[in-house]
A protein has these predicted regions:
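Intrinsic low-complexity, intrinsically disordered or marginally ordered coil/linker segments
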Residues: 2-122
Length: 122
């Protein structure tokens, strides 16, 4: 009986973990900043895609009317915004928003605008 209860509890935990999603972003090899709601950053990659420029987490800041980018990816490391060439807004309904980076999150006293070189929105 004890083993059955333990197995059932472990099954519930595994199913819970599989269903937990986080707001994450990556910067792929083409410099495309992609948003998603996934458990792992690597789930944002399409087949044949790589993520050499890192990633992190994002949240919508209603007060600022912006997307706040923060943290780092355990899969790919800290984001390097110098390589952003375009932003894929499709996950956010195709609507553009200012992008602001919080380098010392959760401290929001320093906010850095993300400016892409040769930016073209997809």
């Amino acid at each position: 009986m004890y083993l059955y209860i333990r197995y059932a509890a472990m099954s519930l935990f595994v199913n819970y973990i599989r269903n937990v999603m986080y707001q994450k972003f990556i910067i792929n090899q083409d410099g495309v900043l992609k948003f998603g709601n996934v458990y792992l950053h690597r789930y944002l990659l399409d087949k044949g895609e790589r993520c050499p420029y890192g990633g992190g987490l994002w949240k919508i800041d209603e007060r600022r009317g912006a997307i706040m980018l923060y943290g780092r990816s355990f899969d790919f490391g800290r984001p390097d915004f110098d390589f952003v060439r375009s932003v894929d807004w499709s996950f956010l309904g195709g609507n553009e928003h200012p992008l602001l980076y919080l380098p010392h999150w959760p401290d929001e006293t320093e906010v850095v605008p993300v400016v892409a070189s040769n930016i073209k929105n997809q």
